[in-house]
């Protein structure tokens, strides 16, 4: 009949937070697959799923000083007691424990009422 139709399709990226949450879940469940030097193949019986992240070398802990990678470590650094993330004491102190220092100061403030 001589008429034509126009169809437009597009894809929208998912919410940024959901992408981050998915990546974190995949990172936390990533599978370590050591390579066998003699055969050049993957060792063991672990077979990753198609959607699973894998890694072949363990990451440094960054807790101890490692000069070859330029990491000063975390020993002696101040941590944030109330933080839950990387700057928090449980993460930053790497299980070595930490000291809590409480101070009470009495100072003259020269306040006038």
UniProtKB/Swiss-Prot annotation:
Any one Gene Ontology molecular-function term assigned to this protein's record: cytokine activity
A GO CC annotation given for this chain: extracellular space
InterPro entries: Wnt, Wnt_C
Keywords: Developmental protein, Disulfide bond, Extracellular matrix, Lipoprotein, Secreted, Wnt signaling pathway
BP term (GO), one: cell fate commitment
Post-translational modification as stated in the protein's UniProt record: Palmitoleoylation is required for efficient binding to frizzled receptors. Depalmitoleoylation leads to Wnt signaling pathway inhibition.
Subcellular location(s) per record: Secreted, Extracellular space, Extracellular matrix
Family statement: Belongs to the Wnt family.
Protein name: Protein Wnt-10
Organism encoding this protein: Eptatretus stoutii (Pacific hagfish)
Gene: WNT-10
């Amino acid at each position: 009949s001589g008429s034509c139709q126009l169809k437009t399709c597009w894809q929208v990226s998912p919410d940024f937070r959901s992408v981050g949450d998915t990546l974190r879940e995949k990172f936390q469940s990533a599978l370590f697959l050591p390579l066998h030097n003699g055969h050049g193949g993957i060792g063991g019986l672990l077979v990753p799923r198609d959607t699973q992240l894998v890694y072949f070398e363990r990451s440094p802990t960054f807790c101890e000083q490692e000069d070859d990678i330029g990491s000063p470590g975390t020993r002696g650094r101040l941590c944030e007691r109330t933080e839950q993330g990387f700057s928090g004491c449980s993460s930053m102190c790497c299980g070595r424990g930490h000291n809590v220092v409480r101070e009470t100061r009495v100072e003259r403030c020269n306040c006038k009422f």
